[in-house]
UniProtKB/Swiss-Prot annotation:
Protein name: V-type ATP synthase beta chain
Organism: Thermus thermophilus (strain ATCC 27634 / DSM 579 / HB8)
Gene this protein is translated from: atpB
Family: Belongs to the ATPase alpha/beta chains family.
CDD domains linked to this entry: ATP-synt_V_A-type_beta_C, ATP-synt_V_A-type_beta_N, V_A-ATPase_B
UniProt keyword Transport, yes or no: yes
InterPro entries: ATP-synt_VA_C (IPR055190), ATPase_a/bsu_AS (IPR020003), ATPase_F1/V1/A1_a/bsu_N (IPR004100), ATPase_F1/V1/A1_a/bsu_nucl-bd (IPR000194), P-loop_NTPase (IPR027417), V-ATPase_su_B/beta (IPR022879)
Keywords: ATP synthesis, Hydrogen ion transport, Ion transport, Transport
Keyword Ion transport part of the UniProt annotation: yes
Length: 478
C-alpha cells in the first residue's frame, strides 16, 4: 500500500452517477478510485472517460451527499482488478466481487484485470469437444461445444431463469472416447446474473444450494437496485474467474450470463448520462464492440487443457429478433437457442423451438468418439421430419385433417409426439444416449423409406425402438 496518495479536489460537476474532475492527468481510463465526501464516507468509482481537461468517474454507489467543495478523489488501482482463487468455488459474490454469503473474504492467489489478458488469435484452438447439458433439444439438435459461445434468446414471461438453473445443475463434460482411456476432467460453472429482482435472487440461491450445484460453481449476483455500473462490471468479473480456473487450473468452465438485456440497458443508461450521441433505438453506437469484449473471451487456447464456454441469455423486447441486442449478439456468437412462446403456452418445458435454433459449431463436437456415430444424421432427420409436421399442422388449420394422406397423418402424429416426448422433458437430466434413444423411437413412427437423411447401416442398427419400451406403456401416444 502506498504511504502517500494523491488526491484530486477539482470536482466541477456532478450529473447523476457521474463525477467530472478537472486536471486529473494521472488518472487513466479504467482506473479504480476512492471518492471521499466531507463526512469521511468513502465510495468506489471507475474512470470511464479521460480528456486533456477532465476525467469522468462513474460512482459505484449513489451520489447523495457529494458536493463540489468537499469531495476528493484518490487513485486505488490503475485498472479494475479482481482477486481470484480456487476458494471461490462454492461461494456467492455481488456484482463487483464482494462476498454476500456471510463467509470470510477469500485469500486471492492473483489479482487479475477484469478486462482480460490479450490473447493471440493464432493461439486459439478449434472447439471440438461435446458438453452435455442434459437437455435433449440442445444436446441432439443444437450441440454445445467446449469453447463455444451459444446464446439463448428468450422473451418476457418465458422460463429463461429455470433453463439457466437447469443447465448449471446438469451440465458436464464427457471424456474424449477416441483417445486411450477416459480421464475425468475438472468442470466448473461460473454464473453471473445482472439486474435481477430479489425474488429471482432467492430462486437462484435456493436452486444452487438445493441441487448441490453450488459446490462446483461461482455465483456473481447483481440486483436490479444495485448501481448501474455494477452491471457493466459483473460479466467481466465472472469471465476473469472463468479464465483463471480454465487457464491456470485446467478446468472446463461453463459461463452462464443472464440477462444480457439488462447489461445493454445499463450501457444505454450510462451513455445517456454522458450525453453521448445514441445509435439504434437509443443504444450506444459502440454496443457491438462492447458485447464483443465479453463474448470473445470464450475459447480454447493452444497449450492449455482448460476451456471457457459461454451461454449468454437475453430477453428479446417484444419477441423481436431484429432488436439491436439479439441482432448484434447473433453477429458475434456461434448460433442461438430460441425459446418459443407457442410451446410455452402448450405447457411444454423447456420450450425450445429447434427450427429457428442453430449451433454453428455442432459438426465439430459430434460423431464417433465424441457422442455417437449416428448423431448428426439423427439430428438432420429430426429437423426435416418436425419441419414437415409443422407445415402439415398449418395446412390442417386451413383445409382440415380429412384431406390429408396417410403419410401426412404420420408426420402430423410425429410432430405432436416430438413436442410431447422429446422437447417436453421437464427437469429430467438426460444423457446423450437417452436422448438419441428417444429420437430413434420417434423416428421409428415413420416408414424407413422416409428416413432419407440416415444411412442404411444406422437404420438397421437403431430403427424399431418403441416409445412404450422407454416409458413402460401405455402412456406413449394415448
Amino acid at each position: 500500500m502506498d504511504l502517500l496518495k494523491k488526491e484530486y479536489t477539482g470536482i466541477t460537476y456532478i450529473s447523476g452517477p457521474l463525477l467530472f474532475v478537472e486536471n486529473a492527468k494521472d488518472l487513466a481510463y479504467g482506473a479504480i478510485v476512492d471518492i471521499k465526501d466531507g463526512t469521511g464516507r468513502v465510495r468506489g468509482g471507475q474512470v470511464i472517460e479521460v480528456s486533456e481537461e477532465y476525467a469522468v468517474i462513474q460512482v459505484f454507489e449513489e451520489t447523495t451527499g457529494l458536493d463540489l467543495a468537499t469531495t476528493s478523489v484518490s487513485l486505488v488501482e490503475d485498472v479494475a482488478r479482481l482477486g481470484v482463487s480456487k476458494e471461490m468455488l462454492g461461494r456467492r459474490f455481488n456484482g463487483i466481487g464482494k462476498p454476500i454469503d456471510g463467509l470470510p473474504p477469500i485469500t486471492p492467489e492473483k489479482r487479475l484485470p477484469i478486462t482480460g489478458l490479450p490473447l493471440n488469435p493464432v493461439a486459439r484452438r478449434k472447439p471440438e469437444q461435446f458438453i452435455q447439458t442434459g437437455i435433449s433439444t440442445i444436446d441432439v439438435m443444437n450441440t454445445l461445444v467446449r469453447g463455444q459461445k451459444l446464446p439463448i434468446f428468450s422473451g418476457s414471461g418465458l422460463p429463461a431463469n429455470e433453463i439457466a438453473a437447469q443447465i448449471a445443475r446438469q451440465a458436464t463434460v464427457r471424456p474424449d472416447l477416441s483417445g486411450e482411456g477416459e480421464k475425468e476432467e475438472p468442470f466448473a460453472v461460473v454464473f453471473a446474473a445482472m439486474g435481477i429482482t430479489q425474488r429471482e435472487l432467492s430462486y437462484f440461491i435456493q436452486e444452487f444450494e438445493r441441487t448441490g450445484a453450488l459446490s462446483r460453481s461461482v455465483l456473481f449476483l447483481n440486483k436490479a437496485d444495485d448501481p448501474t455500473i455494477e452491471r457493466i462490471l459483473t460479466p467481466r468479473m465472472a469471465l476473469t474467474v472463468a479464465e483463471y480456473l480454465a487457464f491456470e487450473h485446467d478446468y472446463h468452465v461453463l459461463v452462464i450470463l443472464t440477462d444480457m438485456t439488462n447489461y445493454c440497458e445499463a450501457l444505454r443508461e450510462i451513455g445517456a448520462a454522458r450525453e453521448e450521441i445514441p445509435g439504434r433505438r437509443g443504444y450506444p453506437g459502440y454496443m457491438y464492440t462492447d458485447l464483443a469484449t465479453i463474448y470473445e473471451r470464450a475459447g480454447v487456447v493452444e497449450g492449455k487443457k482448460g476451456s471457457v464456454t459461454q451461454i449468454p441469455i437475453l430477453s428479446m423486447p417484444d419477441d423481436d429478433r431484429t432488436h439491436p441486442i439479439p441482432d448484434l449478439t447473433g453477429y458475434i456468437t456461434e448460433g442461438q437457442i430460441q425459446l418459443s412462446r407457442e410451446l410455452h403456452r402448450k405447457g411444454i418445458y423447456p420450450p425450445i423451438d429447434p427450427l429457428p435454433s442453430l449451433s454453428r459449431l455442432m459438426n465439430n463436437g459430434v460423431g464417433k468418439g465424441k457422442t455417437r456415430e449416428d448423431h448428426k444424421q439423427v439430428s438432420d432427420q429430426l429437423y426435416s421430419a418436425y419441419a414437415n409436421g409443422v407445415d402439415i399442422r398449418k395446412l390442417v388449420a386451413i383445409i382440415g385433417e380429412d384431406a390429408l394422406t396417410e403419410n401426412d397423418r404420420r408426420y402430423l402424429q410425429f410432430a405432436d409426439a416430438f413436442e410431447r416426448f422429446f422437447i417436453n422433458q421437464g427437469q429430467q437430466n438426460r444423457s446423450i444416449e437417452e436422448s438419441l434413444q428417444i429420437a430413434w423411437a420417434l423416428l421409428s413412427m415413420l416408414p424407413q423409406g422416409e428416413l432419407k437423411r440416415i444411412s442404411k447401416d444406422h437404420i438397421g442398427k437403431y430403427y424399431g425402438q418403441k416409445l412404450e419400451e422407454i416409458w413402460g406403456a401405455p402412456q406413449a401416444l394415448d
